[in-house]
Amino acid sequence: HDSVTGEISPAYLFVGVLSCSSFVYAELCRDMKSENFILCHVHAYEYFGGVTRLLVPDNLKAGVTKNTRYETSIPRAYQEMADYYDTAIVPARPKAPDDKPNAEASVKFATTWILAAVRNRRFFSFEEARDTVAEKLELLNDRPFKARKGCRRSAYEEEEREFMHPLPPAPYEPAIWRSAKVQNDYTIPDGLNRYSVPCDLIGECVDIRLTRDTVEIYFHGGRVASQVRLKKAQRDAVMEPGHMPE
């Protein structure tokens, strides 16, 4: 809730569960667009202290663009993240919860348990709500099982952790991919500013890889330019002298 206007802003809960131990990672996000969706995976791997051999996502747009009996299509940014962590994406079939029955039940339980724990609270900042979800996550993972000894955290440490792949030296930095036609002034936009590319690409369609700090331009699969991404809008394009006509 906005403390001044009373306006309610939505938030989205990301939940990832390890199928053997039911160890949970949950994170509150402002949206579930590609960048946040991928960043939640990065945070989950850091939380688990390792990488799963398989990823079985639900069929939301940020994770699967097409999933039919004959064809599966994964968004480029999501596949790039999976390649970085050396894991395979195997989307669950639409309306087929039996593809991951243990995880499906655990996700539903974790979601219900966390949301039930905060449903009667009114939050006046996203950060407050996010931190509360993080606190409830720890309580959930330390909550004793009813049917057996231990809890989710102890089950993970004893039964599943040794089978996780090791983390890479540095966390993956999420990237957004776009396509654009190079303008007559041999620039492309990133949504905030314009950046130059080699002038001989005028009129060509290029792929743009955007991270928080860099703008990379690819043509026919090869990188042709890379520039530091500006955080603030500026009037003039960012021009690289080597891109200019002779």
Model-derived segments and their meaning:
Residues 107-209:
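Active-site-proximal acidic segments at structured loop/helix or strand boundaries
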Residues 51-70:
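Acidic/histidine-rich, metal-coordinating catalytic segments
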Residues 1-24, 32-36, 173-189:
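Mobile-element integrase/transposase regions
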Residues 8-22, 56, 81, 110, ...:
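Short conserved beta-strand segments at catalytic cores or DNA/RNA-binding microdomains
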Residues 57, 68-69, 89-112, 126-129:
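RNase H-like two-metal-ion nuclease catalytic core shared by retroviral integrases
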Residues 9, 26-50, 231-237:
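Active-site beta-loop-alpha junctions of metal-dependent nucleic acid enzymes
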Residues 71-89:
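Two-metal-ion acidic nuclease core segments, chiefly of the RNase H-like superfamily
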